[in-house]
């Protein structure tokens, strides 16, 4: 078989087999090559000559094969065949040698196979390969000596077969320790026919071309040989590097890792808090015009508050204090120059307003709808402004402050009222001639005198009405007629004792709402009645004589007296 070592056979057996092959040749003429047919009737003399040439050719072929193997090993030190079954691809016009011309000897008699089981225990595969190569050389030499030579063609075929045996042995030596080596006895006739048929292929392919193809296939199947590349284009160091083994980490490295993890966790928490704060805040508004497709709610425009510069409205009867001149212009335009054209539709109201929003705000006061509830005391209000002012009572906040005296208050109206006190010359034109206190109205001055200076009030009344007699019992009534009351001999009307008071004749008795005040004036008595009337005269337990006056005589009005009576405390 090709690729296996053959044992030498004795010359007698070879001659017998050659004779049998010659006898069987005429039976199958189509399978024998023309050279063998022509050489059959040549006789014993020609066969002896051929055998002598064969011996010399076989020896030369063995030497050439050894030289070729050494040269190939030197050129390709790493070359090996992956598997013995790998063969070069068949040429389309060429058939395999075994299938082309089966010899008649194969049909009659199969070669003997000697299978030896070889166990390698401690030997290296390379050493085994060298031993096999050394043992193969004398076997090939003996085979070549026993066979007749047919020329240079047979030497080429022996070289190729020797190469196959080397490849199979090298592959077997690398597979494992347990190897099976099969040897067969050589058949000379079969080898001769095979050699003759190699050169009669229908495609006309020579043995040199076949050897080149085999070498190319073997090189392609083997690993890429090492080549010195000056440009280092084929060098890939990352493939040759081995993965570094993981080193044991020390305690310091673990501590650093833990610190890094803690820092990362803290950073994550801080970022989450920042995101929450950003979510609470309003998103920044985009610049540019608003798209028609944009249906997001519009945010109210915010104007920057100007710096505080208090100014006062100089319009007659106003005196409103404003925080900036710009606000003053707005105030004058809408509060003094603009006409009131919006009328309240409520039947009992009819108030006029300059702006529609003022009318809508006022219309809520005519309803009982209170949508704004205090969270502290659950009190309800009709407007958010009233609720905000009320909430300051619970919080104790007083945002407004007077720049002159530091007075604080919650509402702007309170501050405006307070600021008028600092401008007494312009606003407080009426003053008390006794103490010098100033008032906005004249009636307030009269009420002040009746409360704080009653003796002056009575003296003025006596001076203005001295000796005048009032005979009308209904002084403040609607009947203007004077009625004559029963009187004593002097003609003075007899009046009942006012409030049943009895005092000494040296005191002036004033009574108002059950509160009495006395003033020493000899025998005369002045009494301020509960209905607002004044009695001046002398009174005793036996009878009373005097003058009954109305408060209008003193220049005061009943409105002032009523306002003064409602006020609590001095």
Swiss-Prot record:
Q: Give start-end positions of Basic residues composition bias.
A: 69-82
List the catalysed reactions. S-ubiquitinyl-[E2 ubiquitin-conjugating enzyme]-L-cysteine + [acceptor protein]-L-lysine = [E2 ubiquitin-conjugating enzyme]-L-cysteine + N(6)-ubiquitinyl-[acceptor protein]-L-lysine
Q: Give the stretches traversing the membrane.
A: none
Question: What is one GO cellular-component annotation here?
Answer: nucleus
Does the UniProt entry include the keyword Zinc?
yes
The protein's location, in the record's own words, is: Nucleus
Which pathway is it part of? Protein modification; protein ubiquitination
Pfam entry (one): zf-C2H2
The record ties this protein, via SUPFAM superfamilies, to: beta-beta-alpha zinc fingers (SSF57667)
- Region (Interaction with MAP3K14/NIK) residue spans: 338-368
Compositionally biased spans, kind Basic and acidic residues: 1-12, 119-128, 224-245, 252-269
Q: Which InterPro entries match?
A: Zinc_finger_trans_reg, Znf_C2H2_sf, Znf_C2H2_type
Compositionally biased region (Polar residues): 94-104
Q: Describe the family membership recorded for this protein in Swiss-Prot or TrEMBL.
A: Belongs to the krueppel C2H2-type zinc-finger protein family.
Give a short account of what the protein does: Atypical E3 ubiquitin-protein ligase that mediates 'Lys-63'-linked ubiquitination of MAP3K14/NIK, leading to stabilize and activate MAP3K14/NIK. It thereby acts as an activator of the non-canonical NF-kappa-B2/NFKB2 pathway. May also play an important role in cell proliferation and/or anti-apoptosis.
**What is the protein named?**
E3 ubiquitin-protein ligase ZFP91
Task: Please spell out the taxonomic lineage of the organism that makes this protein.
Answer: Eukaryota, Metazoa, Chordata, Craniata, Vertebrata
Q: Which gene specifies this protein's sequence?
A: ZFP91
């Amino acid at each position: 078989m090709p690729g296996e070592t053959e044992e030498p056979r004795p010359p007698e057996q070879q001659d017998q087999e050659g004779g049998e092959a010659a006898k069987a040749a005429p039976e199958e003429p189509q399978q024998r090559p023309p050279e063998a047919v022509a050489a059959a009737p040549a006789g014993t003399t020609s066969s002896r000559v051929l055998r002598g040439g064969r011996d010399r050719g076989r020896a030369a072929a063995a030497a050439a094969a050894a030289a070729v193997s050494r040269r190939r090993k030197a050129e390709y030190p790493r070359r090996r065949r992956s598997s013995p079954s790998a063969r070069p691809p068949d040429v389309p016009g060429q058939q395999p040698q075994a299938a082309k011309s089966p010899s008649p000897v194969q049909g009659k008699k199969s070669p003997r196979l000697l299978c030896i089981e070889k166990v390698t225990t401690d030997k290296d595969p390379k050493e085994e390969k060298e031993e096999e190569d050394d043992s193969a050389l004398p076997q090939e030499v003996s085979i070549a000596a026993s066979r007749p030579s047919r020329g240079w063609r047979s030497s080429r075929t022996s070289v190729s077969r020797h190469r196959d045996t080397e490849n199979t042995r090298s592959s077997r030596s690398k597979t494992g320790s347990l190897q099976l080596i099969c040897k067969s006895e050589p058949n000379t006739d079969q080898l001769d026919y095979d050699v003759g048929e190699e050169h009669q292929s229908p495609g006309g392919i020579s043995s040199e071309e076949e050897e080149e193809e085999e070498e190319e296939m073997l090189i392609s199947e083997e690993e890429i040989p090492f080549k010195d590349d000056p440009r280092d284009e084929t060098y890939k160091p990352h493939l040759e590097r081995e993965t570094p083994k993981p080193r044991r980490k020390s305690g310091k490295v673990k501590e650093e890792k833990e610190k890094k993890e803690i820092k990362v966790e803290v950073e994550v928490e801080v970022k989450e808090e920042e995101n929450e704060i950003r979510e609470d805040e309003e998103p920044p508004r985009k610049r540019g015009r608003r798209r028609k497709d944009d249906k997001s709610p519009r945010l109210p425009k915010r104007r920057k508050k100007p710096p505080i510069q208090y100014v006062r409205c100089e319009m007659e009867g106003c005196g409103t204090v404003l925080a900036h001149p710009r606000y003053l212009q707005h105030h004058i335009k809408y509060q003094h120059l603009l006409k009131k054209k919006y009328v309240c539709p409520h039947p009992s109201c009819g108030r006029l307003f300059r702006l529609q929003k003022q009318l809508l705000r006022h219309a809520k006061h005519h309803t009982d709808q209170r949508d704004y509830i205090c969270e502290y005391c659950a009190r309800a209000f009709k407007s958010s402004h009233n609720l905000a002012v009320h909430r300051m009572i619970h919080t104790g906040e007083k945002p407004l402050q007077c720049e002159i005296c530091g007075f604080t208050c919650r509402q702007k109206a309170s501050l405006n009222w307070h600021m008028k006190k600092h401008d007494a010359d312009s606003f407080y034109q009426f003053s008390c001639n006794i103490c010098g206190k100033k008032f906005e109205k004249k009636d307030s001055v009269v009420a002040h005198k009746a409360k704080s200076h009653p003796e002056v009030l009575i003296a003025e009344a006596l001076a203005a009405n001295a000796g005048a007699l009032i005979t009308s019992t209904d002084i403040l009534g609607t009947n203007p007629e004077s009625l004559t009351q029963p009187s004593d001999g002097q003609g003075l009307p007899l009046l009942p004792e006012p409030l049943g008071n009895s005092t000494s004749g040296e005191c002036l008795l004033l009574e108002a709402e059950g509160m009495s005040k006395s003033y020493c004036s000899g025998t005369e008595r002045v009494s301020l009645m509960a209905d607002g009337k004044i009695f001046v005269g002398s009174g005793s337990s036996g009878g009373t004589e005097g003058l009954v006056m109305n408060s209008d005589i003193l220049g005061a009005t009943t409105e002032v007296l009523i306002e003064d009576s409602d006020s609590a405390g001095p």
